[in-house]
Amino acid sequence: MNSVSPSGVQYMVGAGAHDDRPSAQSRHHNGHGPVPDAIREEPDEVDRLKAKFISAWNNVKYGWTVKSKTTFNKTSPLFLLGQSYLFNSEDEVERFRQVFVSCVWLTYRREFPQLEGSSLTTDCGWGCMLRSGQMLLAQGLLLHLLPTDWRWLECHPLSDVDFEVLKPRSPSRPAGMSLPSFSSSWTSPISQRDPGSGSAEGHRRTPEQCPAAGHDPQVEALHRKVVSWFGDHPSAPFGVHQLVELGKESGKRAGDWYGPSVVAHMLRKAVARTPVFHSLAVYVAQDCTVYKGDVMGLCESPLTQERSESGGTGWKSVIILVPVRLGGESLNPSYIECVKNILKLNCCIGIIGGKPKHSLFFIGFQDDQLLYLDPHYCQPVVDVTQGNFSLESFHCNSPRKMNFSRMDPSCTIGFYAQTKKDFESLCSAVSEALSSSKEKYPIFTFVEGMGQNYGLEGQSAGSMDGPANIFSCNRMSRNNKRGSTDEFVLL
């Protein structure tokens, strides 16, 4: 096996990463029902040793990987965060690279401060859904706080990718005319490094080599601030430490598996409890239904002298999270076209889901393959409390793809609307995308009015700190059986 060091490749590949291990604090438990709090919050010495052993094994497992190459089709469009790219020129590859590398990449970390109530100092092996949720929220915050044309200036070349003509010919080109190959132009910086240096500084592109990026020190400082909010430190508002604390309200503990629906509600509460976000709300759909009245109620809550000029007085921007289930034990192929149409929308900020017990963050697709960011790579903790902490490990230059058929049906879809007009456009565009489903029932729906009018608890500003309400599909009168024990709606 061609194994390389953690600094050599950014991704775990293959099917060996599963997050279905038992909690490190469950040694005394018989495996039936929830683990008693008294056991879990007071780990004894044996539990600590066991947790350290498991953590050490996971650090090794997720810190090394097999080098592979991702191939992109030069004759088919690729969609990334609502934008289309056709790799028929180096300019188009460069445009894609700038957007992809600018995405915030959050992965397993090791050696961070101990999580409260446990002996864990790493989330390796169990925290991938938390990391995927963090990436989804980070994308929403970048849209909310930074200019729409912002690009990260530390432009890394794409690593381990190739661009090929995967079809006999392009309809727009005469027979016999081949497209140029760009693979030689985008060699991995790893292969060009000084083996003893361990640094890619000499191969990093300067701002002058990134003509579309522009430079604004205040914007770059804000970008760094956003990343710091996801740091692995107890004070980081969206870090693993805070999310684990919020998970306790849903009966979860450090070391447990977190489903995409639970993570959606954890993100909602995390944003609501962060004072800096007076101009942003997070809404989580209930029963695969977005109640427009509830969204309006959240967004029309009073603001405190923040941005309201573009969306009407007192209007908050909103991140909408929709937990869904796209099949039974596996993805229903009838929903693939619908998922593609959703990922084509500018208002879509990604999907958290992945393979079974192996969460990924989906940000686009090409043909029948999803484009994703993978959290299953263990990196040393970065001290984000330092003013000039390194951003390199929070951005990825290795795009990865997988077939739609490998996508787990349990997922959460994210959307962002900055203004009231944007929200209205979102409802229209997403509804049109949902209508492309070949199934009788859409993935989810938009409904006028409020959830309480249908017997559900709404998500008003006053209820944001309450426990997450996760509803089953029993109220939806759909004669389908549940395909698993997860708390998602089966379509």
Where are these predicted regions, by residue range?
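Cysteine-dependent deubiquitinase/ubiquitin-like isopeptidase catalytic cores across multiple families
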Residues: 2-122, 126, 132, 138-491
